[in-house]
Amino acid sequence: LVVGADEAVLGRAPQFEDGCLTVDLDLPAAMAAGPPLGETSHEYTADYLVRRSVLSTESLAPYTPEPAGVAPRIPDQGEVYAAVVTGLRDYVRKNGFQSVVLGLSGGIDSALVATIACDAIGAQNVYGVSMPSSYSSEHSKSDARELAERTGLRFATVPIGPMVRAFLDNIELTGLAEENLQARARGVTLMGLSNQYGHLVLATGNKSELAVGYSTIYGDAVGGYAPLKDVPKTL
């Protein structure tokens, strides 16, 4: 962004995109010819020789400055989305990852994170995993599949029922403890895929959930990066 003395916008590059902005400035005429600023009349001696070559004694003719491009400003919500995409892309690349993996529940948060990941590093590098339990509705499972089809990400289904049952056969858990066990089975699954294939696990929680602790430690809170960690649910 380049702003003039009168606060007018002289040039603005596209936001959150690689590019180069060049601005020609219509500057006032230079001062009368004289010694460079800071130069004195003292004579200096040194063990080197300076040769000056004059290519032309004619002054360069002035030219009309070319107007710089002023890219339109992204609306607030679009700006937040672009910032989140850029942040995820930079984090993945600068930490040496080639791909990401996340759980797809059929809900809005995981759908948004999956879309952000596809825009950031390409759908071919995004792995979405549906991990249904005996309590999962057909609607949530079909929504996860449809999201994968629409975005083009790599999709797999890993039922967690047998994992949960193995725990419950050995530990008596009910109510909230059993519900959290399902979330933790999903977390273990994602971390296992990460260790096996080198994916970065993305957590899908948003700022509102993290602020009030609405998540399961070692469960849906698992992950190396949470794209929505600074995005409130209300946005």
Model region roles, listed by residue range:
Residues 1-76:
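C-terminal beta-strand edge segments of enzyme domains
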Residues 79-101, 187-193:
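Phosphate/ATP-binding catalytic cores across multiple sugar-kinase/actin-like superfamilies
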Residues 89-98, 119, 123-126, 166-169, ...:
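Conserved helix-loop functional segments at active or binding sites
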Residues 151, 172-235:
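Active-site adenylate/phosphate-handling loop in enzymes that bind or generate adenylated species
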